[in-house]
């Protein structure tokens, strides 16, 4: 949110067709691919739900970084990240409820919707507003430079905490999780590229 500017929203008006195709692909390819892998690999309910949840989440900043490193269309990637994030309070609970209904884990859409608003949309909105109001402030610009590092450190702490608290279970299923995530990401890249190719995008 702190790096989001009004310029990032211009692509939505300039390339609405591409953005629509990207949003549709985001919430069709990754969720249904995750669902297919849970069935193909016969994953336990807990791991299956986790993979489906990942598949139903919006594209994050990492997609923008990968686009940059691979020489892709970074502006389009940022636009897609923005749209998929704005759609996530509705699409993520909806898709998870639909695809994870076969597990023995209770899925509650409304609490998930509220949680996404609180943890994703609200912080992004506050960051965008601060950037809009204070973007030219020297101190704020210095803060912007260090925030990505702080965010990565915070994420590492969260992941480390989860892994350490579930260490035995994680290592018991480590190979299965690795294979599932590798296939999900690899096939997601291929299918996403194919969707762009089929719709005439510059690939």
Can you say where each PLM-predicted feature lies in the sequence?
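Alpha-helical transmembrane segments of multi-pass small-molecule/ion transporters
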Residues: 2-203
């Amino acid at each position: 949110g702190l790096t989001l500017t009004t310029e990032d929203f211009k692509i939505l008006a300039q390339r609405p067709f591409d953005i629509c195709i990207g949003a549709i692909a985001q919430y069709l390819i990754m969720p249904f691919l995750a669902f297919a892998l849970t069935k193909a690999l016969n994953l336990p309910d807990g791991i299956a739900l986790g993979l489906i949840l990942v598949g139903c989440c919006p594209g994050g900043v990492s997609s923008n970084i990968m686009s940059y490193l691979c020489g892709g269309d970074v502006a389009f990637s940022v636009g897609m990240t923005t749209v998929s994030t704005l759609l996530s309070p509705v699409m993520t609970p909806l898709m998870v409820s639909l695809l994870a209904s076969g597990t023995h884990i209770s899925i509650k859409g409304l609490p998930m919707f509220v949680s996404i608003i609180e943890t994703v949309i609200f912080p992004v909105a506050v960051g965008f507003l601060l950037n809009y109001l204070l973007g030219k402030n020297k101190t704020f610009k210095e803060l912007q430079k260090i925030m990505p590092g702080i965010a990565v450190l915070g994420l590492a702490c969260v992941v480390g905490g989860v892994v350490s608290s579930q260490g035995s279970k994680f290592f018991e299923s480590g190979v299965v999780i690795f294979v599932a995530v590798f296939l999900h990401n690899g096939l997601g890249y291929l299918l996403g590229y194919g969707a762009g190719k089929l719709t005439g995008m510059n690939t």
